[in-house]
Regions:
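Short active-site-adjacent structural elements
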Residues: 179-183, 247-252, 419-422
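Alpha-helical repeat solenoid scaffolds
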Residues: 39, 223-231, 251-255, 259-268
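A glycine-rich phosphate-binding loop feature that marks nucleotide/adenosyl-phosphate handling sites
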Residues: 243-248, 345-348
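Nucleotide/pyrophosphate-binding catalytic subdomain
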Residues: 1-246, 312-319
Length: 444
């Protein structure tokens, strides 16, 4: 441990180093040009304060066509040398091998953590080799699973390291990219809130998407690996993307041209918002999914206008907490809601109530009459002040609301409301209500 402490004292760390782990799933599929482009992306990432760590999956040996231990080892070495050479014009990197032992129970044990720590503290990019030594034997093995990435994360989050660095991002770079979406027939899920969406995405992969057996297995394994990762380290942001997207050099901040890794380091957001309507032509299709542990969503929805929710009764039964709901609305809008007056107006006419986490965000949808017909109307959309800058909460609430009211949803906003740009992007139609200060929005 003294070597790590020495290294950290040497460079006098003034702040925690933010690491970004890139798991390269099939290095054997990469061209020299793609490796060079990755070097440029890594250089940009480092200029933004991120410290990249590259983990090479052992699946690259599928192009080796040999079972000989020595041949496999030489093949992996040659692939790592090729990567090192192609990166060398952009960043200083170092291949790390021998950091882990493969125990008899199949688990990886960190033998020399400073083998990863020291290069990071010296401003180098560690490239973790999938070749490990079998404990107690002079034999070597090639790790083909998520276990290697997981061991690297454990090493970087160990007590020795945790004061000096944090793991912020874990990026899976492979041929399949993000999780395919039935709804986005030509693209992938944009932002996945794993607590809320794991089962739905698993169901899509297994039952709803037309995939080859190999593609299905890759997507399922990615989903399960992300769940393992975020269950253990809930504050990490996961990304899944393709080689093409990960090595994009373009700087244009629009849709497909944005490198998703660089964009996420800058903003912690996907390159487009997950609550944008899929059907709109202006919503770009991407091959990247951002994955968060996310936030629990509670949804109370009614099927018909004559079955409006009784919020007071739900509060009495402990199903909801009106005191917390009032605090959320007050804090979000910066004014004191007269709850008694509000409930007199909407109670028993509430079409839906959506609550994110512990009342950190929420939406109240009411049934309103229009020409004798009941329509779902977004009465309140609120996010507490301290979470308003955090990507995703408004998106997650909005997405849950759109899923609950697919047929039709209306809302209005003052014409000078700065949030209107966000609303324009999420509505299918909108128009200015003549002679008033309101603009009406529609989706469905």
């Amino acid at each position: 441990h003294s070597r790590i402490n020495y290294a950290s004292n040497e460079i006098k760390l003034t702040q925690t180093i933010r690491t970004c782990i890139l798991r390269i799933k099939r290095l054997d599929h990469w061209t020299d040009k793609q490796m060079q482009n990755l070097g440029n992306v890594l250089r940009k990432a480092m200029s933004l304060g991120a410290s990249p760590v590259i983990v090479i999956d052992g699946k690259l040996i599928e192009s080796c066509h040999s079972d000989e231990e020595k041949t496999i080892e030489l093949y992996v070495e040659s692939q790592l040398e090729k990567l090192l050479l192609n990166l060398s014009d952009y960043v200083s990197a170092r291949v790390v091998q021998g950091c882990f032992d493969l125990q008899k129970d199949g688990k990886l044990n960190t033998v020399v953590p400073e083998m990863i720590g020291a290069p990071i503290f010296s401003g180098l990019v560690p490239i973790i080799s999938p070749i490990v030594v079998k404990e107690g034997l002079l034999k070597k093995a090639c790790i083909k699973s998520f276990a290697l990435t997981s061991a690297v994360i454990d090493c970087l989050q160990s007590d020795d390291m945790t004061d000096m660095l944090s793991v912020e991002k874990v990026v899976f770079i492979g041929q399949t990219g993000g999780f395919l979406s039935v709804e986005r027939s030509r693209g992938t899920h944009v932002l996945v809130n794993l607590l809320q969406e794991f089962d739905d995405i698993e169901d899509e992969i297994v039952n709803k998407l037309e995939l080859s057996k190999e593609q299905r297995e890759i997507h399922l394994s990615n989903l399960k690996d992300m769940k393992l990762l975020l269950d253990k380290s809930p504050n990490i942001t996961g990304l899944l993307t393709t080689i093409e997207m990960a090595t994009k050099e373009e700087e244009k901040q629009v849709g497909k041209e944005t490198n998703p890794i660089i964009f996420n380091i800058l903003t912690d957001r996907p390159t487009i918002s997950s609550s944008l309507p899929v059907s709109l032509r202006r919503t770009p299709q991407l091959n990247t999914t951002v994955v968060k542990k996310g936030i629990e969503i509670s949804e109370f929805l009614t099927k018909a206008p004559n079955e409006g929710l009784d919020l007071m009764e739900m509060d009495k039964k402990g199903m909801i907490d009106l005191r917390k709901l009032k605090f959320l609305i007050d804090d979000s809008f910066g004014r004191d809601l007269n709850m008694e007056h509000y409930l007199n107006r909407v109670n028993n006419r509430v079409a839906g109530l959506i609550i994110a986490g512990d009342y950190e965000g929420g939406a109240i949808i009411t049934w309103e009459k229009a020409e004798g017909k009941s329509v779902a109307y977004l009465d309140k959309l609120a996010v507490i002040k301290e979470k308003q800058g955090i990507p995703g909460i408004a998106d997650i609430v909005f997405k849950a609301m759109l899923n609950g009211f697919r047929e039709e949803l209306l809302w209005r906003s003052r014409k000078n409301n700065p949030v209107n740009k966000w609303y324009f992007e999420r509505s299918k139609a909108n128009y200015s209500i003549g002679g008033t200060q309101w603009r009406l929005f529609y989706t469905g």
